[in-house]
């Protein structure tokens, strides 16, 4: 094994560890803002894996589209709609945790069996000539409708988050004006 192969294997191992730790942080951290930042880190690690697989265009698209656009929209939505609520633990919380653990473990076993039962191809012939134009043609011809649906869905999500945040701000401003003037609150009659 040459030195460059060792460096490539070490880089792949570090990116895989970063992806797994970041994904666990996204799921397990109680602060949703930190989860959003870790999601960006996971997406950057995945782009690094694409770079190691000699798919530079996919890596650049991963960073531009997912990290640069979608993760920023998610973080804006989190910051605009971040409500601090006290969650009351329910009586059947233990049953919910057990059921969700069972479902996650079942999916893990199912995916593990699928991975080990799949016949993987050792080498894949990748044609780099005109690959970017082929991807662009597929996106804007065969996959135009899903592409537009996703863009409209992201736009509606962002507009909805702004609308919800502004609606809450208006009610808070109205309540603060009433308390400033020492007037009785009309909602408490």
UniProtKB/Swiss-Prot annotation:
NDH is composed of at least 16 different subunits, 5 of which are encoded in the nucleus. Its EC number is 7.1.1.-. Belongs to the complex I subunit 6 family. This is NAD(P)H-quinone oxidoreductase subunit 6, chloroplastic. Keywords: Chloroplast, Membrane, NAD, NADP, Plastid, Plastoquinone, Quinone, Thylakoid, Translocase, Transmembrane, Transmembrane helix, Transport. GO terms for molecular function: NADH dehydrogenase (ubiquinone) activity; quinone binding. Its main location: plastid. It is found in: Plastid, Chloroplast thylakoid membrane. The lineage of its organism: Eukaryota, Viridiplantae, Streptophyta, Mesostigmatophyceae, Mesostigmatales. InterPro entries: NADH_UbQ/plastoQ_OxRdtase_su6 (IPR001457), Nuo/plastoQ_OxRdtase_6_NuoJ (IPR042106). Pfam families: Oxidored_q3 (PF00499). One of its GO terms (cellular component) is chloroplast thylakoid membrane. It catalyses: a plastoquinone + NADH + (n+1) H(+)(in) = a plastoquinol + NAD(+) + n H(+)(out); a plastoquinone + NADPH + (n+1) H(+)(in) = a plastoquinol + NADP(+) + n H(+)(out). The keyword Membrane applies. The chain crosses the membrane at residues 10-30, 32-52, 61-81, 98-118, 144-164. NDH shuttles electrons from NAD(P)H:plastoquinone, via FMN and iron-sulfur (Fe-S) centers, to quinones in the photosynthetic chain and possibly in a chloroplast respiratory chain. The immediate electron acceptor for the enzyme in this species is believed to be plastoquinone. Couples the redox reaction to proton translocation, and thus conserves the redox energy in a proton gradient. The gene is ndhG. It comes from the Eukaryota. Coiled coil: none annotated. It is a multi-pass membrane protein. The keyword Chloroplast applies. It is an enzyme of class 7 (translocase). It comes from Mesostigma viride.
């Amino acid at each position: 094994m040459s030195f460059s192969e060792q460096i490539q294997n070490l880089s792949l191992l570090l990116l895989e560890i970063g992806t797994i730790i970041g994904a666990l942080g996204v799921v397990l951290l109680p602060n949703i803002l930190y989860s959003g930042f870790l999601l960006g880190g996971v997406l950057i690690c995945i782009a690094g894996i694409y770079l190691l697989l000699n798919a530079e265009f996919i890596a650049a698209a991963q960073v531009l589209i997912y990290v640069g656009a979608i993760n920023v929209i998610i973080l804006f939505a989190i910051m605009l709609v971040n409500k601090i609520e006290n969650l009351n633990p329910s009586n059947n919380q233990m049953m919910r945790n057990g059921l969700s653990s069972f479902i996650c473990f079942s999916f893990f076993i199912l995916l593990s069996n699928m991975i080990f039962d799949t016949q993987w191809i050792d080498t894949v012939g990748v044609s780099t000539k005109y690959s970017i134009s082929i991807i662009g043609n597929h996106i804007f011809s065969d996959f135009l409708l899903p592409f537009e649906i996703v863009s409209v869905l992201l736009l509606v999500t962002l507009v909805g988050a702004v609308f919800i945040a502004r609606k809450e701000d208006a009610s808070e401003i109205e309540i603060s004006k009433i308390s400033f003037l020492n007037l009785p609150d009309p909602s408490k009659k």
